[in-house]
Regions:
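Long extracytoplasmic/lumenal interhelical loops at the membrane interface
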Residues: 306-343, 363-366, 370
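Hydrophobic transmembrane alpha-helical segments in integral membrane proteins
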Residues: 1-17
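Alpha-helical transmembrane segments
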Residues: 18-25, 83-84
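Membrane-interface alpha-helices at helix entry/exit sites of multi-pass transporters
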Residues: 35-41, 120, 189, 212-215, ...
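Hydrophobic alpha-helical transmembrane segments of multi-pass inner membrane proteins, especially
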Residues: 64-295, 334-392, 419, 423, ...
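A juxtamembrane structural motif centered on a specific transmembrane helix
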Residues: 389-457
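Membrane-interface helix-loop junction between the first two transmembrane segments
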Residues: 22-40
């Protein structure tokens, strides 16, 4: 009976997630009435809770552990709190962005509970704390206008944080990426990404002459080189690409972009020659089967898992994702593909793409160049991190050890990503307020002109 329920549950989750994904892009349509958009967003919200409930029915049936039901209730309350708080405190916030945040958290909770209950429990409490922190950020974005003047402070704090990790950080898989403070492991580079975007936007939003570009490039290079020195090459790549995109959009000069790509290619060749763990990952990427007993074991297990899942997956607890090393962090996408299926995994990618499109949409709508660059930079950080994660586990590119935002286990990544989404929400609200103020000004102007005409007659 349990196997039958697992099988039915699998197809139900795929159907509901495909429906949710369709609604993501339906909400982007321009010619849609406000009430229709509200119906779409409400249906999305219902789909989130149905998928969550369906998955935990299976988890409880397989584990026969009452604590799973308690944990399910706690997660459902958290998801409801996120939805309610954003609507209560920020009625002008983007419900689509909030829905996507909750959906990605839900998928993460489901898979982490299945893979490691202890990791899922820690992730839940971090998400709870992250929600509290992130709810403050939209207020700051709207009311603290001088934040654009603090760009040098952002750069100094970011560089110092990265230096501390390089000097006194913990080594994990060949890279120094975290610090232990009072028994808690923190990965500063996750937060420095946000500071870095604000720094670059602050430098380039007013002036893009050659001198300013050179100074900004030098400071950006310092960030990247510190990460390279600590052997966090995945993080260095994210910083590099983010800066390149922001620089090109700010200056609109193809020369800078092409030059940056050339420097990036040279740096990649240099990294291959300098770092042994980079060579190991390249070997595992080129021909993992030839080194399946050593360097290629992780990527081979990842590919086996994805292949085993097929289009519809094996169902929760019916696969063997725990054979993949570090599956809760870098390779959680493989576990999702194996047990929930290729269709579910593709829908997950599409939801991530819809988030990125939302970021770009907000960037294009912002009138002030500073906020435009911030939205674009944060969107690039998010999208490129998703690309590195999924590209690594599918053997599209060499593995970089980057986590899947909001889904993978990782406290610093989760908190930083929720803060990133909160900044975007703040920008969205700011744009809504700008639009309303412009409409009022236009209405006043029209009313004044009408009065002048009436006086003439």
């Amino acid at each position: 009976m349990t196997n039958l329920i697992i099988e039915i549950s699998k197809y139900f989750m795929i159907f509901m997630f495909a429906f949710y994904t369709y609604e993501c892009f339906a909400a982007f349509r321009q010619k849609i009435k406000p009430e229709q958009r509200e119906h779409i967003l409400s249906r999305q919200c219902a789909a989130i809770f149905l998928i969550h409930f369906d998955a935990f029915v299976v988890i409880y049936l397989v584990t026969d552990d009452i604590s799973m039901l308690i944990f399910y209730a706690a997660q459902a309350v958290l998801l409801a709190m996120i939805q309610t708080c954003y609507q209560l405190f920020y009625s002008r916030s983007s419900r689509l962005l909030t829905n996507n945040l909750c959906m990605l958290l839900t998928i993460g909770f489901i898979m982490l509970t299945r893979l490691s209950f202890d990791s899922a429990r820690k992730q839940y409490f971090i998400a709870l704390v992250s929600m509290i922190f992130s709810l403050i950020i939209p207020v700051l974005i709207n009311r603290v206008g001088f934040v654009r003047k603090l760009y040098w402070l952002f750069a100094i704090v970011g560089i110092l944080a990265l230096l501390v990790v390089t000097i006194a950080g913990n080594t994990s898989y060949g890279a120094k990426i975290s610090l232990s403070i009072a028994g808690i492991s923190i990965q500063p580079s996750e937060f420095v990404k946000i500071l870095f975007v604000f720094f670059v936007a602050g430098m380039l939003y007013k002036n893009t002459d050659f001198k300013t570009v050179c100074i900004t490039t030098i400071v950006a290079a310092v960030h990247v080189l510190i990460l390279v020195a600590s052997r966090d090459l995945g993080g260095a790549l994210i910083f590099f690409v983010t800066y390149l995109v922001m620089l090109y959009v700010a200056t609109r000069k193809l020369f800078y972009f092409a030059g940056g790509l050339l420097v990036g290619c040279i740096a990649a060749v240099a990294a291959y020659g300098l770092f042994s763990h980079v060579r190991v990952r390249v070997v595992a990427w080129r021909d993992p089967l030839s080194v399946i007993d050593n360097e290629g074991y992780q990527i081979c297990q990842s590919l086996f898992a994805i292949g085993t899942g097929g289009w519809f997956g094996t169902g929760l607890y019916q696969g063997s994702p725990n054979k993949i090393p570090v599956v809760e962090q870098d390779f959680i996408f493989s576990a999702i593909s194996e047990e929930l299926g290729g269709i579910f995994a593709i829908c997950l990618i599409m939801v991530c793409i819809s988030c990125f499109l939302m970021f770009l949409n907000i960037a294009m709508q912002m009138k002030e160049q500073f906020y435009k660059l911030v939205a674009l930079g944060l969107g690039t950080v998010y999208a490129f991190q998703v690309f590195l994660t999924i590209g690594g586990v599918t053997k599209f590119i060499p593995s970089t050890g980057v986590t899947l935002p909001l889904v993978s286990y990782g406290g610093s990544s989760l908190l930083a990503t929720m803060m990133l989404f909160a900044v975007i929400q703040g920008l969205y609200i700011l744009r809504q307020d700008e639009g309303e103020n412009n409409a009022r000004k236009k209405q006043r102007k029209t009313g004044y002109e009408r009065q002048q005409v009436e006086e003439l007659y």
